Amino acid sequence: MSGIGSKRAAGEPGTSVPPEKKTAVEDSGTTVETIKLGGVSSTEELDIRTLQTKNRKLAEMLDQRQAIEDELREHIEKLERRQATDDASLLIVNRYWSQFDENIRIILKRYDLEQGLGDLLTERKALVVPEPEPDSDSNQERKDDRERGEGQEPAFSFLATLASSSSEEMESQLQERVESSRRAVSQIVTVYDKLQEKVELLSRKLNSGDSLMVEEAVQELNSFLAQENTRLQELTDLLQEKHCTMSQEFSKLQSKVETAESRVSVLESMIDDLQWDIDKIRKREQRLNRHLAEVLERVNSKGYKVYGAGSSLYGGTITINARKFEEMNAELEENKELAQNRHCELEKLRQDFEEVTSQNEKLKVELRSAVEEVVKETPEYRCMQSQFSVLYNESLQLKAHLDEARTLLHGTRGTHQRQVELIERDEVSLHKKLRTEVIQLEDTLAQVRKEYEMLRIEFEQTLAANEQAGPINREMRHLISSLQNHNHQLKGEVLRYKRKLREAQSDLNKTRLRSGSALLQSQSSTEDPKDEPAELKQDSEDLATQSAASKASQEEVNEIKSKRDEEERERERREKEREREREREKEKEREREKQKLKESEKERESAKDKEKGKHDDGRKKEAEIIKQLKIELKKAQESQKEMKLLLDMYRSAPKEQRDKVQLMAAEKKSKAELEDLRQRLKDLEDKEKKENKKMADEDALRKIRAVEEQIEYLQKKLAMAKQEEEALLSEMDVTGQAFEDMQEQNIRLMQQLREKDDANFKLMSERIKSNQIHKLLKEEKEELADQVLTLKTQVDAQLQVVRKLEEKEHLLQSNIGTGEKELGLRTQALEMNKRKAMEAAQLADDLKAQLEMAQKKLHDFQDEIVENSVTKEKDMFNFKRAQEDISRLRRKLETTKKPDNVPKCDEILMEEIKDYKARLTCPCCNMRKKDAVLTKCFHVFCFECVKTRYDTRQRKCPKCNAAFGANDFHRIYIG
């Protein structure tokens, strides 16, 4: 393709000029290398040789150009890579420099309190590398991006200005930027120094001992910190806003980068495809050049020559002779005339065919109408019509009879089915009633059983509790009786000890009166000091043992009480949980019973509404059964309440056992106190015996004084003992009252035991009642079973009725059979009539055969006419063809007789060149050459038209309206 185009282009500037003139023109402009063509016999050979040499030179020039293009392409790629690395490094430097300036500005805003530095670094300029514009379709997008970015930053295109400016201007601009950064850094240093000075002043004021200075420093520091806080808050808000805007811009830029990367990948793929296409075209061009050279060599070697006034092999193509061109034009005109003649003939034939078809249809319609009229007028048709009408009337009558029989049969069947359905409905409703009643009774029975089981379990629990409490109660009775006896004995002993004390006091008074001498005092002085501390020790030990014993007994009692209290609390908690569970179960059962009763009542109401007129007796029975069941339910609920009360009574028993434990502890305490009193009485008796012995001794007089002192001490002790005795007596009274309370409590417990026994008896009676109810329910169940049997008997009776109805149905079916027999006889008569009709049809067939014979003869005549007309048409056709041949031969004769008025070959070539140029120009704009192909439909246009169509979203082929996309058009290179 490119080779052919280049050859034409080389030969375009006037082919009529001879080669000598061409060389002269070339010499006038440029120096051309001389080429030896060898021996040439004619101008045609000279043209061929010159063209061959031109082709070779052009091929060499193309190879050189291709090599230069490859070198330049590699050089361009290297430069692009270098530029990309330089741009990347410049962008990195600019980014970090701008970041540095931004950080300096933020630091100044952060620390400079005196002046607002919002506009400090307005001179800061961002290094932005202008991206290359690879395609025309992306230019508009970049313009839009620039328009958007113009309002965002004041100095946006620093690198662009650097690229457009000279080296001196670049140095000045960079110097300005460095100066601005240096000034910002120096300002940071000054700000930091100011802050340092301020901090030092505040620290001096704070460190100074003066309170006023400290207050001033604190106030200044507070104000400073408040200002700093507000400034920092503003700064954080500003930075947050900036961060938001930057994040949004970053997301936008990231999306743009992704789209650009996808576009770059698409463009790279397109470049690869185009490169591959170029390589392919070049290979093809080289192959064609080689092939053309071989063809030319063969032509030269074999000695082919092309003669004619303007014939020449130009650019690898052989031009056409003018005479041949005229001949071809003449032939084309003749062919046009022939085509017109043929078209006229075809039109005539089509019109004739339409006329014949219309006549044929008319004749068919006339034939049909004529045959029907003829058949209707025949006497056989009229006879058949009368017979058909008679038979049709008879068949209608038979149909009416048959329909009546069918309606009767359907009616009887319908009534029978309705009766059966009614019986089945009654049976189903009765079954449902039975089921509901049985289910209700079973539910009530199950509830009664559950309640009975619950009561039995509770009764067993109460029995077990009573069995456990029985031996405890017996032991308590024995203990109480033994304690009563023991208390009586203790009272007697106390009275006896009181008497002994009175006697001892009287004896002591007597001894006081007797002892008066000093001898007894001296004798007693040696022995009494030894005895007194021993006695005192004994008394103190007795008191300690008494207090320890009382404390131990109290602790034991408290421990027992605490254990019992814990056990009772656990029991109470368990019993409460059981009660709650039982109450929940009972509530659930009650709800179920209510739901079931509601459902049963609804079902009964529905059943009653359906069968009000039929089952009055059944209603009364059901109402009585329901009343009985309700009464039994009420009784069961009352018995349940009584059982609950009994359970509560049994649960209250452990609390009374607590009082028993307290009484036991009080009794133990009183026993211990009585034992202590006995021991003290024994000690006093021993002392009296010792004193009597001492008084009998000779040294009694000496010890009188000591005895008097001892008497005083003993008097004090006696007063103490009296007080203790009074306390013991009060305690004895308290124990007596407690004992009386215990007796009363025991009486109450006995009453409760009796009540429990009565409750147990009631439970047993209720159990007997429940057994009786169970028996009654069984009897009711048996009655219901009897009712079921009666219903079954009713169903059997209804089945008998159904059988009778079926017998009636059989009778009706026999009647239908007789009717069908009559119908068969009628059908036989109809068949006889059909036979007659068949005979008439045979007659009609004979007539048809005669008619067909006549039609055959007519067809034969028609065929002969058609054959004659066809032969005539053939003769006419041959005559026309002969006339056309004569006219064509006459034209040839005229052309041979005419002189040679053939135009020059250069004019023909120029017209061909114009035609080819018109073909190579774009049909959309009629300006540019075709250099883009649509791969969907393979129509060729210029790349600018296709691109504008793609950008303006008119993505359809201008010729065939085939849709195309971004990857569906490619560049092509034609010469």
Swiss-Prot record:
Annotated GO CC locations: HULC complex; nucleolus; nucleus; ubiquitin ligase complex
Molecular function GO terms recorded: histone binding; p53 binding; transcription coactivator activity; ubiquitin protein ligase activity; ubiquitin protein ligase binding; zinc ion binding
Keywords attached to this entry: Acetylation, Chromatin regulator, Coiled coil, Metal-binding, Nucleus, Phosphoprotein, Transferase, Ubl conjugation pathway, Zinc, Zinc-finger
Zinc finger (RING-type): 922-961
Residue list for modification N6-acetyllysine: 21, 348, 510
Keyword Metal-binding: yes
Protein name: E3 ubiquitin-protein ligase BRE1A
Region annotated Disordered, chain positions: 1-37, 125-155, 507-622
EC number assigned by the record: 2.3.2.27
Segments forming a coiled coil: 43-90, 168-375, 429-898
Main location per the UniProt record: nucleus
Biased composition (Basic and acidic residues): 139-151, 527-540, 558-622
Pathway(s) served: Protein modification; protein ubiquitination
Entry's localization field: Nucleus
Subunit-level organization: Component of the RNF20/40 complex (also known as BRE1 complex) probably composed of 2 copies of RNF20/BRE1A and 2 copies of RNF40/BRE1B. Interacts with UBE2E1/UBCH6. Interacts with p53/TP53 and WAC. Interacts with PAF1; the interaction mediates the association of the PAF1 and RNF20/40 complexes which is a prerequsite for recruitment of UBE2A/B. Interacts with PA2G4. Interacts with FBXL19.
Ribosomal protein listed as a keyword: no
Catalytic activity: S-ubiquitinyl-[E2 ubiquitin-conjugating enzyme]-L-cysteine + [acceptor protein]-L-lysine = [E2 ubiquitin-conjugating enzyme]-L-cysteine + N(6)-ubiquitinyl-[acceptor protein]-L-lysine
Example GO biological process: positive regulation of transcription by RNA polymerase II
Family: Belongs to the BRE1 family.
Protein task: Component of the RNF20/40 E3 ubiquitin-protein ligase complex that mediates monoubiquitination of 'Lys-120' of histone H2B (H2BK120ub1). H2BK120ub1 gives a specific tag for epigenetic transcriptional activation and is also prerequisite for histone H3 'Lys-4' and 'Lys-79' methylation (H3K4me and H3K79me, respectively). It thereby plays a central role in histone code and gene regulation. The RNF20/40 complex forms a H2B ubiquitin ligase complex in cooperation with the E2 enzyme UBE2A or UBE2B; reports about the cooperation with UBE2E1/UBCH are contradictory.
Gene that specifies this protein: RNF20
Gene3D superfamilies given in the database record: 1.20.1170.10, Zinc/RING finger domain, C3HC4 (zinc finger)
Polar residues composition bias: residue spans: 543-552
Enzyme class: transferase
Modified residues (Phosphoserine): 41, 136, 138, 522, 562
